[in-house]
C-alpha cells in the first residue's frame, strides 16, 4: 500500500479495516457509516440521501479521491460546471452515465485500489 493510500485509510491513529463493496452497500442499512476514508463516508451519506453532510465531509479533503467524490456530488446536485471542475481536479473524465452506476464505480475503485 503506498503512503497516500495508507494516510487515506487511517482515522484517529488507527488503521481502518478493509471492506469490500458488498459490505459497504450493506452498511447503508445501519444508522452510522463504517470506519472508512472521508471520500467513502461522503458517498455513504450521499446514498442515504444526505447530500449536505456528504458535501461537508468531502469539501475540505485533498487528493484525487476526494475530488472525484466532490465531482459526483455536484453532478447529483445538477451543478455540471462545478462538477466539471472537480472531475478535472480528480483527473477523471466527466461522467455521463447513470448516477447510481457512477456511485458504484467510485465505491468499487476506492475500496479495491
Residue ranges and their predicted role:
Residues 27-32, 55-64, 91-95:
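Solenoid-like repeat scaffolds
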